[in-house]
């Protein structure tokens, strides 16, 4: 075999080795990409499922806390979270973890376990009420449509998640976020429907509920009926156009 043939054979072998190496690298990159896409896809699906729950959440406060041991101190984070559907259901939760996202996730889970219904009339509460927790006191009063939520940050978070759009509030005593939020929850849990109060007292509804509340409820019922009729008419028009 001549020197030229030997060189050509060596070049051919090197070319084959290079092609094989590049092919293996591409295969490994493809497998890594598939694994990465799988993980990202799973996370994306979880986010979409969480978004599908249609729940609002507000992180009221995040505190850094520490626990002293014999060998030193361990630091962690505590998150106070409010969760609600924006339509009369709300809950408050408290979560602790060494990482902030984990603490918030635990707070959301705890809030979902303690959700309750809030009586409302056209976006406001049914009657004045006062809630307490430790040294904190929160006063809630009904408000006319368009008033808005007159409240501080802690109380506002609870009102927004509960779907209350018009309310007057006053916070007294302790200004600690945990006490204020828990006092607000205590006040909301004391709210009652006018029918419940009338049944308990053995009186007629108009003898218990003020005229303004009855007018607001009647207006709310009329608005809801009108919205349903408009939605039904729009749906019928779409079906007719489709035919």
Swiss-Prot record:
Keywords: Ribonucleoprotein, Ribosomal protein, RNA-binding, rRNA-binding. Disulfide bonds: none annotated. Residues 1-10, 25-50 have a biased composition (Basic and acidic residues). Residues 1-50 are annotated as: Disordered. GO terms for biological process: translation. GO terms for cellular component: small ribosomal subunit. The keyword RNA-binding applies. Residues 12-23 have a biased composition (Polar residues). It holds the Pfam family Ribosomal_S5. One of its GO terms (molecular function) is rRNA binding. It comes from the Bacteria. Residues 55-118 form the S5 DRBM domain. The keyword RNA-binding applies. Part of the 30S ribosomal subunit. Contacts proteins S4 and S8. The N-terminal domain interacts with the head of the 30S subunit; the C-terminal domain interacts with the body and contacts protein S4. The interaction surface between S4 and S5 is involved in control of translational fidelity. With S4 and S12 plays an important role in translational accuracy. Belongs to the universal ribosomal protein uS5 family. NCBIfam families: rpsE_bact. This is Small ribosomal subunit protein uS5. It comes from Bifidobacterium longum (strain DJO10A). The gene is rpsE.
